[in-house]
């Protein structure tokens, strides 16, 4: 139903995090009466944004058992709320419409939209596409899981402005509007298995993006993911990767599109398969479809700054290099981070376990990682799975891990924070964790 048809009606928002608050504000602006439910209401009630929403009529409660779903015309669920939440199950039983904040924003949008998903690299590719488009006169804004909810911006975007949406699997679970002009699936590796239980379920969520394309839309998929999950790709798509059979590919010297050479890679990009190069291919596939010429892409690439906490060099002290990869929150991200550092590595890992095995690290760590410092809730599991093959030391906190790693490392080594886990056992989020790591390193 178009958003204007909800004027004067009632909406229930489940979860009042960043996207839930944005959805509440958006609905209030659209003339909708809003009830929000959040189990952490007592911690939220005095926050400025919540107070502002309440002043405009938002009603909030923590208890979901007393809610009568029959009185609501629309139910909006926040990304972190699992599909087995009692209210969601009850809503489906009552045949009530349940959507996410992204779907809500798209219903009010007449803009051109690009979608970006995958396990690792989503934020970087979203920001890179946005940067390339803006640098070449195509006004664009990065929204969604990158940090700014779509509903917070959609009513103020210029008519010609392009929305570049970073989409998590959680957001895709409640997104079905066919509004995307282009979309890309970057890679699919183990993550969020505490929610999805199997890789098959996780991959299905990622490939939901293909169902959100316009009829004229174009989907690009990283080749390995396309091969492994071919049975889930029951819609048209093109691949990118390292083989000439891909729509967009590289031979590690140049980039090709449909077999035609586009440009020679800058020297620092040549010679080695890596995560950054795959991100570049994904961004170029999208940008080329938007009319960006090869040299325009290369010129804009020179001024792109990679977002923080992604194998970010912090400083060098006594010949030891320190790197912050706090955004490395899954198994594959840690392996990519370790492979990107051309020094012996002392690795700080751990946090909230996400259901995958750490054994996969061993093939990459052999001869490269000298020692692992395990922290947080996952520390014992990391030690149990790795300690027969590599030195693992459990530390009480990040502070102790940083100090011990610095003490053990010597000139020419690297200390890398790449947790492979979520952050919320000890930190507010991965940004808080990364900033704390930097602070501790600077105190050494």
Curated annotation (Swiss-Prot):
The protein's annotated pathway: Cell wall biogenesis; peptidoglycan biosynthesis
GO molecular function terms attached to this record: ATP binding; tetrahydrofolylpolyglutamate synthase activity; UDP-N-acetylmuramoylalanine-D-glutamate ligase activity
Lineage of the species this protein comes from: Bacteria, Pseudomonadati, Chlamydiota, Chlamydiia, Parachlamydiales
Catalytic activity: UDP-N-acetyl-alpha-D-muramoyl-L-alanine + D-glutamate + ATP = UDP-N-acetyl-alpha-D-muramoyl-L-alanyl-D-glutamate + ADP + phosphate + H(+)
Record-listed E.C. numbers: 6.3.2.9
InterPro entries documented for this protein: Folylpolyglutamate_synth_CS, Mur-like_cat_sf, Mur_ligase_C, Mur_ligase_C_dom_sf, Mur_ligase_cen, MurD
Subcellular location: Cytoplasm
Annotated GO CC locations: cytoplasm
Key word Cell wall biogenesis/degradation present: yes
UniProt protein name: UDP-N-acetylmuramoylalanine--D-glutamate ligase
Pfam families: Mur_ligase_C, Mur_ligase_M, MurD-like_N
Enzyme class: ligase
Subcellular location, principal: cytoplasm
Protein's job: Cell wall formation. Catalyzes the addition of glutamate to the nucleotide precursor UDP-N-acetylmuramoyl-L-alanine (UMA).
Residues involved in ATP binding: 118-124
UniProt keyword Cytoplasm, yes or no: yes
GO BP annotations listed: cell division; cell wall organization; peptidoglycan biosynthetic process; regulation of cell shape
Keywords: ATP-binding, Cell cycle, Cell division, Cell shape, Cell wall biogenesis/degradation, Cytoplasm, Ligase, Nucleotide-binding, Peptidoglycan synthesis
Annotated disulfide bonds: none
Protein family (similarity comment): Belongs to the MurCDEF family.
